Amino acid sequence: MHISMFDFSIYIKFFVSLCALVNPIGMIPIFTTMTNHQSHLERKKTNLVANFSAFIILLISLFAGNSILNAFGISINSFRIAGGILIISIAFSMISGKFTKNNKTSKEKNQENISVVPLAMPLIAGPGAISSTIVWSTYYSTWSDFLGCSIAIFLFAFVCWLCFRAAPCVVEILGKTGINIITRIMGLLLMSLGIEFLSIGIKSIFSALLH
């Protein structure tokens, strides 16, 4: 299978957009807070299950998301606009410093299922990541594109796993200020992505109305 450098840039952009949307480094304090009652082995298991679950959720969104939209009679352009607005709102909360604070309120001490809820969903594979994945699947819908995007999702889940695995060290090295700076940078990248989704959706709808 021949994949051009342009194709690689598409998958890299998708991978970067997921990282910017979820901000794994910014999630480290949340993961640490939620698992501080667990032993080292329990924390490792929680990390693995959470990221594997998020990987499966995003894969389902990639392969079946468009069919789900069609079943509900939702046009992809409407979904692009909704997804763009959602991503912009998340980006704004990240830039303004409210993102981490809001997520901390979802802290749960329930040992049994925090790996799936709320870690895998909605914190890792949340509405923003799911909507972004569905929109991406409509842009690039060949099997080679699905394979490339699947690899990007796997690498994203692996990066999240690495960040959570190294959580104690990262918190100690970066500190609260460093994590806040990274969160704001990710927010700017995310804002640009949301505006791109929004503008493409609006242009497509107006173009259809004019014709």
Curated annotation (Swiss-Prot):
A single cellular component GO annotation: plasma membrane
Keywords: Cell membrane, Membrane, Transmembrane, Transmembrane helix
TM spans (from-to): 14-34, 54-74, 76-96, 116-136, 144-164, 185-205
Key word Transmembrane present: yes
Membrane topology of this protein: Multi-pass membrane protein
Recorded family membership: Belongs to the UPF0056 (MarC) family.
Name of protein: UPF0056 membrane protein BUsg_257
Organism listed in the record: Buchnera aphidicola subsp. Schizaphis graminum (strain Sg)
